[in-house]
């Protein structure tokens, strides 16, 4: 790859994807959501089946183990287990709850164990008149209703298909965990809130003794330790770790409006910052999912769209050259879906990326991405400077709104995707259950 100036590329990308680009994009997309059938529409992806997850359609992160799917919920305070031995007919077989007002929406499966995020059901404890309040305020300033909940990391034995038996719980005083990364092994990398901090920070957990997990380190951006008197982060911006993904002795972390960091984690008890880059401004922020492609020394980083009807402009997924980890450089963005006007209702833009977990579909050339309102997108990134969309699937509009927050549009909220090595996908939507799809590439 030729040498590229980070500042130059940010300026170029900002010019290409600014307000003028949004206007031109909107004019070029004409099809409406009303013409999407129940099985969705797409290219290169076949619809296999649909499940309302036993009447709990608010699905978020998906894990797969021993022919069973484990799905965390956004609003239902629990985890549903589905028998996926026949992908054409998913069968709910069990439901775990950590208790009322405890959200367990994110989880990680490896080595016949399931690690589950436990934290405040934030939606039930906030008082905003629209969704943007959650994304534009620190977590501690968002909570206006005090309720009892469980905060910390629960560990479950899932060696018996269809069951999850809790074998350990690590309490984390605060509002709890948002998301975590654990592909197996000794250490889990957790995004958690602790009392005294403004929002979720990095917490490294040692699992050497699985029944006695132990916190060995914490790391945060300057300004997040309110109890220590650190100067406040910018008002109207949310600096918070969404999550970290590791590759070897490097950790890649997304901090919402706080940008993107790369860490040396060769000593998990002492993670060291190598670089910190933030493209907001000029972009809208919401940096959400950091997917390293270590063999190619690239990272794919998705910014989560978080405003109704594109009120903040378009959000993007960036391709970064990380050959020099002390100086990551944005070199491209994944193409924005254009076959219809996705800005007319609800939120439109990137959400998650399939994370190349061990045992799942793994590729540094084919990227699976989920989009609010625009379903699943598959990209060819063999030319990192010119990614191409090679397949897509768009879901129908949900029949009803599950999200209890006010002023939320009735639109698809395609959330997460787990892709098996054979290309079979389990795709969640926090309003509309789960679709099973088959990638045909």
Locations of the language-model features?
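Feature marking well-ordered beta-strand scaffolds used for ligand recognition
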Residues: 9-25, 31-441
């Amino acid at each position: 790859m030729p040498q590229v100036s980070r500042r130059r590329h940010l300026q170029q990308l900002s010019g290409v994807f600014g307000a003028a680009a949004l206007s031109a994009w909107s004019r070029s997309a004409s099809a409406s959501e009303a013409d999407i059938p129940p099985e969705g529409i797409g290219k290169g992806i076949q619809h296999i089946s649909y499940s309302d997850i036993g009447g709990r359609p608010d699905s978020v992160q998906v894990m797969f183990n021993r022919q069973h799917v484990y799905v965390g919920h956004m609003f239902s305070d629990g985890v549903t287990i589905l028998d996926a031995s026949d992908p054409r007919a998913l069968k709910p077989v069990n439901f775990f709850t950590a208790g009322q007002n405890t959200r367990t929406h994110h989880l990680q499966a490896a080595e016949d164990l399931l690690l589950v995020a436990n934290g405040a059901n934030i939606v039930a404890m906030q008082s905003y008149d629209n969704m943007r309040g959650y994304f534009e305020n620190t977590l501690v300033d968002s909570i206006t209703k005090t309720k009892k909940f469980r905060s910390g990391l629960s560990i479950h034995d899932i060696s018996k298909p269809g069951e999850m038996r809790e074998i350990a719980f690590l309490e984390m005083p605060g509002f709890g965990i948002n998301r975590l990364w654990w592909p197996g092994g000794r250490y889990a990398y957790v995004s958690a809130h602790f009392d005294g901090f403004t929002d979720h920070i990095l917490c490294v957990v040692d699992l050497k003794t699985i029944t006695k997990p132990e916190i060995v380190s914490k790391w945060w951006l300057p300004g997040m330790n309110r109890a220590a008197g650190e100067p406040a982060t910018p008002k109207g911006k949310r600096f918070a770790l969404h999550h970290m993904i590791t590759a070897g002795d490097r950790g890649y972390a997304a901090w919402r409006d706080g940008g993107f960091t790369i860490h040396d984690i060769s000593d998990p008890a002492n993670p060291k910052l190598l670089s910190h880059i933030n493209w907001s401004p000029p972009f809208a922020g919401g940096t959400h999912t950091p997917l390293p492609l270590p063999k190619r020394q690239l990272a794919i980083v998705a910014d989560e769209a978080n405003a109704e009807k594109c009120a903040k402009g378009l959000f993007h997924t960036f391709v970064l050259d990380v050959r020099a980890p002390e100086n990551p450089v944005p070199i491209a963005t994944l193409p924005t879906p254009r076959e219809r006007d996705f800005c007319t209702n609800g939120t439109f833009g990137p959400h998650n990326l399939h994370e190349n977990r061990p045992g799942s579909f793994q590729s540094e050339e084919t990227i699976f991405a989920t989009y609010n309102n625009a379903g699943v997108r598959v990209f060819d990134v063999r030319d990192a400077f010119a990614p191409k969309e090679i397949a897509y699937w768009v879901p129908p509009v949900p029949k009803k709104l599950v999200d209890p927050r006010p002023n939320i549009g009735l639109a698809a909220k395609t959330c997460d995707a787990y892709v098996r090595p054979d290309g079979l996908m389990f795709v969640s939507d926090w309003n509309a259950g789960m679709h099973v799809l088959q990638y045909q590439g």
